[in-house]
């Protein structure tokens, strides 16, 4: 064999120097054609790709004629054409014999994915060639994903039918999309309207209000900030409330609408801006600071509270100052909001807290909290005035109560004018009870005494001098009474003691004491019956003061002003 003929094609374009037996033993044919010709796939060997084990290459088919630049084939060499497979016969043969069909790469991959179990089964026929399928391991998953996404409906149905029939080789697992580690553009919360801040890790709630259009923006609507929250569920709840306020109960919420029945009733009396402001106040802090008030941030160095208001001087924020407390900074923001935005401004506190007229008429900012200070002064004056009114009302009530209470309390000085005959009476039909009954013996109704308040004051003034004389004359008896009071302190309260079987009455002029005695011969138990009388010198006859009869309670008058004690 000539050593120069190892190329399998003649070097001379006109004369062939190859012997005839080389042409018959050649199993492959390298045909170089145009770009639009059928190009073999570079991932497989030529012999493995184009061999039809069943002799499917049509004998009468013509191979497309192309320009033969190197002069490999001649028109008379028909014995070499049996190794070529016509283009039309490739599509008519079984798809399992070929891995890549000409230039249509994607449908072949689909067929490969659907017939994967058949590709690895060996044909045990000895005289037939084995169909060999090669694939890249690193690109198998990607090819399966492409096949799943790009397959036509007809091919998808064919894949489903082949996967159901060929169950012996194993089921085909559907390729799932691979998630990358980068979370950019993906949702950071399972709840609607909730996002997780990538730096702070806190959850923020936003609502897209598409009812307005901002200047300079092509997209309709604006983003409404609903506050920052430590828990994801709280942020989702804030979104639900804002969505119910904006779009009504027909909107989609994270939680059932039945959880917000109370809030739905409250939001009916508020506008959208007011309700959003109330939601933000209830949040655990805004994104720019840990303040619950609008427009208030905390300084990162000295910890004081700063107030700012945005979009009043162009697109920049207006600095309002630094304050010692969070509430003062919130008030400064409210004043600036009222100044720039009028009565429709969203404030931290109620707008009636401020002097709106003074704020709107002012030409300087910051107002320095002057409106708030003036309001605080007015509130202080109002509270002091109300306090004085309450004190005066309480003093008048105390005086009236003391005057009305003197009718039953013997320690009052007004009782010097009235002889109080007291008696302990016990109804005979209730003698088995041990509670004595204390009554006032009065000819008229006791309500008349309450009506005669002015009369008592007049009588007190008229008999002031006589009372002083009486006290001087009875000074020697007061020592005796004081000594007895020290040994019996219970009598200072004017009560009747059943345990001691004694009763007493205390007045400014003296005290009367009586011992227990029996009433009637049929009484089973003893009970005290005491009458005490201390008569003032009468001013004409035996008639007492205030409708009281002084003659009923004593066996005889006591002009000396000394008490008379006796037992009946």
Curated annotation (Swiss-Prot):
Induction: By auxin accumulation. Its main location: nucleus. Residues 190-256, 292-350 bind DNA. It holds the Pfam family AP2. Residues 151-171 have a biased composition (Low complexity). GO terms for biological process: auxin-activated signaling pathway; ethylene-activated signaling pathway; meristem maintenance; pattern specification process; root development; root meristem growth; stem cell population maintenance; telomere maintenance. GO terms for molecular function: DNA binding; DNA-binding transcription factor activity. It comes from the Eukaryota. Residues 151-173, 548-568 are annotated as: Disordered. Expressed in roots, seedlings, flowers, and siliques. Also detected at low levels in leaves. In roots, specifically detected in the distal root meristem, including the QC. This tissue specificity is regulated by auxin gradient and depends on PIN proteins. Stabilized in root meristems by reactive oxygen species (ROS) mediated oxidative post-translational modification triggered by RGF1 hormone peptide in a RITF1-dependent manner. GO terms for cellular component: nucleus. Keywords: Activator, Auxin signaling pathway, Developmental protein, DNA-binding, Ethylene signaling pathway, Nucleus, Repeat, Transcription, Transcription regulation. SMART domains: AP2 (SM00380). It is found in: Nucleus. Probably acts as a transcriptional activator. Binds to the GCC-box pathogenesis-related promoter element. May be involved in the regulation of gene expression by stress factors and by components of stress signal transduction pathways. Master regulator of basal/root fate. Essential for root quiescent center (QC) and columella specification, stem cell activity, as well as for establishment of the stem cell niche during embryogenesis. Modulates the root polar auxin transport by regulating the distribution of PIN genes. Essential role in respecifying pattern and polarity in damaged roots. Belongs to the AP2/ERF transcription factor family. AP2 subfamily. This is AP2-like ethylene-responsive transcription factor PLT2. It comes from Arabidopsis thaliana (Mouse-ear cress).
């Amino acid at each position: 064999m000539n050593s120069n003929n190892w190329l399998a094609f003649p070097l001379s374009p006109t004369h062939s120097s190859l012997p005839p037996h080389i042409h018959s033993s050649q199993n492959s044919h390298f045909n170089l054609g145009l770009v639009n010709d059928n190009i073999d796939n570079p991932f497989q060997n030529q012999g493995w790709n184009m061999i039809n084990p069943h002799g499917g290459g049509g004998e009468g088919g013509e191979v497309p004629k192309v320009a033969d630049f190197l002069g490999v084939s001649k028109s008379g060499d028909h014995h070499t054409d049996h190794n070529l497979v016509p283009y039309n016969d490739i599509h008519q043969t079984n798809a399992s014999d070929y891995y890549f069909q000409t230039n249509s790469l994607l449908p072949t991959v689909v067929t490969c994915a659907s017939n994967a179990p058949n590709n690895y089964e060996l044909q045990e026929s000895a005289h037939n060639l084995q169909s060999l399928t090669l694939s890249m391991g690193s690109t198998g998953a990607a090819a399966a994903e492409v096949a799943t996404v790009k397959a036509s409906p007809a091919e998808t149905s064919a894949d489903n039918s082949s996967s159901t029939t060929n169950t012996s080789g194993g089921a085909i697992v559907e390729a799932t999309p691979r998630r990358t580690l980068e979370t950019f553009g993906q949702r950071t919360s399972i709840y609607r309207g909730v996002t997780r801040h990538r730096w702070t890790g806190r959850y923020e709630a936003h609502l897209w209000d598409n009812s307005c259009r901002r200047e300079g923006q092509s997209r309709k609507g604006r983003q409404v900030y609903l506050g920052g929250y430590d828990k994801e569920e709280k942020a989702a709840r804030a979104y639900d409330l804002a969505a119910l306020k904006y779009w009504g109960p027909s909107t989609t919420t994270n939680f059932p609408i039945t959880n917000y029945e109370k809030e739905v009733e409250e939001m009916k009396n508020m506008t959208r801006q007011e309700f959003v402001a109330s939601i933000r106040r209830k949040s655990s802090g805004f994104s720019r600071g840990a303040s619950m008030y609008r427009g208030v941030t905390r300084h990162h160095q000295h910890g004081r509270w700063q107030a700012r208001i945005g979009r009043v001087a162009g697109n920049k924020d207006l600095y309002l100052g630094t304050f010692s407390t969070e509430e003062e900074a919130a008030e400064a923001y409210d004043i600036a909001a009222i100044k720039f935005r009028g009565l429709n401004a969203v404030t931290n506190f109620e707008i009636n807290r401020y002097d709106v007229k003074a704020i709107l008429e002012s030409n300087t900012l910051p107002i320095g909290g002057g409106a708030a200070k003036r309001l605080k002064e007015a509130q202080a004056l109002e509270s002091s005035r109300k306090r004085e009114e309450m004190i005066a009302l309480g003093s008048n009530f105390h005086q009236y109560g003391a005057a009305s209470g003197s009718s039953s309390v013997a320690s009052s000085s007004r009782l010097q004018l009235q002889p109080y005959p007291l008696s302990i009476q016990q109804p005979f039909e209730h003698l088995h009870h041990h509670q004595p009954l204390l009554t006032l013996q009065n000819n008229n109704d006791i309500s008349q005494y309450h009506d005669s308040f002015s009369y008592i004051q007049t009588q007190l003034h008229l008999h002031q001098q006589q009372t002083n004389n009486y006290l001087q004359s009875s000074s020697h008896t007061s020592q005796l009474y004081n000594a007895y009071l020290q040994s019996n302190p219970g009598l200072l309260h004017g009560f009747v003691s059943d345990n001691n079987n004694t009763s007493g009455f205390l007045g400014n002029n003296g005290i009367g004491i009586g011992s227990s005695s029996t009433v009637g011969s049929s009484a089973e138990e003893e009970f005290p019956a005491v009458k005490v009388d201390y008569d003032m010198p009468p001013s004409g006859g035996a008639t007492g003061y205030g409708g009281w009869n002084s003659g009923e309670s004593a066996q005889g008058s006591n002009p000396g002003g000394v008490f008379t004690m006796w037992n009946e």
